[in-house]
Amino acid sequence: MPKKLDIEKKTIAISMLCEGNSIRGVERMTGIHRDTIMRLAVRVGDGMKKVQDELFTGLDTDRVEVDEVWGFIGAKKATVKRKALSKDYGDVWTWVAIDAESKLVPTWHVGGRTFDDAYVFIGDLKKRLVKRPQISADALKSYEGAIEDHFGANVDYGSIIKTFSHTALERPQRYSPPEVISIKKEVKQGNPDVDKISTSYVEKQHHTLRMHCRRLARLTNAFSKKRENFEAAISLHYAYYNLVKTHGTIKCTPAMEAGKADSFWKVRDLVEQGEAAV
């Protein structure tokens, strides 16, 4: 029977994962078997999803930015199609909402990039807010119907439309992002402050996610093999981001800035609270 990990070893392993290390990298540095690390990460991630679901409600939020970030499970979409792989494999999108002022990420949704996913995501956002927000999104059409269905007339909603250079995609440096050649803002509903229609903060959060969650880092062989592992990793990242890590702009955690935490959490708190919630 494998030896049970003590809280110190659990904390070290989770800290390493939250700072962007891979499962096998943590195994090499700690001597803890990769399967044990994975089971621990799933338990803590699943538990912290429940903790955050309960904690991040009743939010007095003025401005919210929403966007989606791409990833994949098992194999990319083209490979799944070419090799006729399991339907559980393929592209996956993480829908993210961020409070533009506190920088809190109160909700996210892992799924496809469909109206049904937008509907679930926006519905969860709506139930966490206590007043009329300004919502900024990109030009994805699914947002329009989802926001109208859940918020009705009680929202100020604008979209930011970026036009990219197609020639940038054809350059030899194919991994470089395409050049943005124009940006247009559109009022979709209500009376949003046009100057504050933006997705800059949520796009920056995507960068933070990719830096801190190894399975979303670009151009590596680190990726999720199972949907439940992916979802737990996303939850673990946002627990660390919201509750533990000092945000460079606000000089505290987003949860503290939003009035949902009195002090900095420690990674040990994530482990203990997460395992207790499962």
Language-model region placement:
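Residue-level recognition of single "structural anchor" positions
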Residues: M1-V278
